[in-house]
Each structure stands twice: as C-alpha cells, then as structure tokens.
UniProtKB/Swiss-Prot annotation:
Functional description taken from the UniProt entry: Forms part of the ribosomal stalk which helps the ribosome interact with GTP-bound translation factors. Is thus essential for accurate translation.
Keyword Electron transport: no
GO BP annotations listed: translation
Top-rank taxon: Bacteria
Name of the gene encoding the protein in the UniProt record: rplL
NCBIfam families associated with the record: L12
GO cellular component, one term: cytosolic large ribosomal subunit
Family, per entry: Belongs to the bacterial ribosomal protein bL12 family.
Protein name: Large ribosomal subunit protein bL12
SUBUNIT field: Homodimer. Part of the ribosomal stalk of the 50S ribosomal subunit. Forms a multimeric L10(L12)X complex, where L10 forms an elongated spine to which 2 to 4 L12 dimers bind in a sequential fashion. Binds GTP-bound translation factors.
Keywords: Ribonucleoprotein, Ribosomal protein
Length: 124
C-alpha cells in the first residue's frame, strides 16, 4: 500500500525539531545525499552593473563650496534643516555627505540645489 503525500506531510508536521533532525540524518544516510544548501552561480559578467542598477538609496556629497560660500550654506540649511553654525561647519569641512540614504529623485534635487548655489556636488 502506497502512502499519500498528505499522510507524510501530516506525520512530518507533528514532529519535534529533534525528530526532524533525526529524520534528515536518516535520509542522508539512506540515500547518500547532503542537506547542505546548493550554491547558485550568479549572472555571468555585468554583475557590477546589475548591482549598480539595484541601488535605491543614494548619498549626496558636497565636494567643495566653490566661490559663493554663503549661498552654499543657505542651500545646505534648506536641504538638511541644520542651524547656521552646523551648516557652516559642514560646508567648511567639505568633502562631506549632505544627505544620506535618500531616493534617487531627492538626491538629484539636492545635487542640483547645491550646484545652483555654486558648490561642487556628487551622488554616490
């Protein structure tokens, strides 16, 4: 008499973790197999390009203040909500991140605002 899959699943469902571990070992011995996970090969070539496409969070870096430091400080204050002293310290300490872990659209907007103020900025 054949045992139905449902009967096997019901029996396994009722087992404790210790009993399941013993069952796995018995399968390994009986059939000469291993329960270790199989390593799957990644996509050939272009792996770095695929990883770059999947990036969802970006960092806007202020590289240098440029000629109009006051305008850059104002832009940094608008973007970050920092106080005057904190924004000035950030601009003086460039290169520094202005915004971190933001979506692409927000990063582009922040970079444009900084560049419009005269700063050099980049998105990482």
């Amino acid at each position: 008499m054949a045992i139905a899959k449902e009967d096997i699943l019901a029996a396994v469902e009722g087992m404790t973790v210790l009993e399941l571990n013993e069952l796995v070992k018995a399968f390994e011995e009986k059939f000469g197999v291993s329960a270790a996970a199989v390593a799957v090969a990644g996509p050939a070539g272009g792996g770095a390009a695929a990883a770059a496409e999947e990036q969802t969070e970006f960092t806007v870096m202020l590289l240098e203040a440029g000629g109009n430091k006051v305008a850059v400080i104002k832009a940094v204050r608008e973007l970050t909500g920092l106080g005057l002293k904190e924004a000035k310290d950030l601009v003086d300490g460039a290169p520094k991140p202005v915004k971190e872990a933001v979506p692409k659209a927000a990063a582009d907007e922040a970079k444009k605002k900084l560049e419009d103020a005269g700063a050099k900025a980049e998105i990482k």
